[in-house]
């Protein structure tokens, strides 16, 4: 998930969003989660780096991901922190061996 903050230069807004993301670790179905910011790599035509904060989660199954979507902690995150972002892009990936 990639978030573009309404105020991308605001360290306070970035910290608040990360604080909100940390609450999502309390969702039992989330097996693993990390968040980050754009890497300081050399510019390349294929790199998108204008976003503010990202988070990646792993779930054991699609059913667990579905349960996460309606979980009260996720719903509270959206309600309490969505005012911080102007855009969100989600890339759902199913990993198969």
What do the predicted segments below correspond to?
Residues 1-56, 60-67, 94-97:
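Short S/T/G/P-rich N-terminal loop/turn motif that feeds into the first structured element of a domain
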Residues 9, 25-28, 72, 81, ...:
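Sec/Tat-exported extracytoplasmic proteins
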Residues 62-82:
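C-terminal structural segments of small proteins and small subunits
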Residues 80-97:
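Charge-dense polyanion-binding interfaces
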């Amino acid at each position: 998930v990639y978030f573009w903050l309404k105020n991308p230069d605001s360290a306070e807004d970035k910290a608040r969003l990360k604080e909100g993301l940390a609450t999502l670790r309390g969702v039992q179905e989330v097996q693993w989660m990390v968040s980050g910011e754009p890497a300081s790599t050399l510019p390349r035509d294929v790199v998108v780096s204008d976003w503010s904060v990202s988070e990646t989660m792993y779930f054991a199954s699609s059913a667990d991901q579905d349960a996460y979507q309606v979980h009260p902690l996720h719903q509270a995150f959206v309600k309490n922190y969505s005012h911080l972002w102007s855009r969100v892009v989600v890339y759902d990936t199913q990993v198969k061996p």
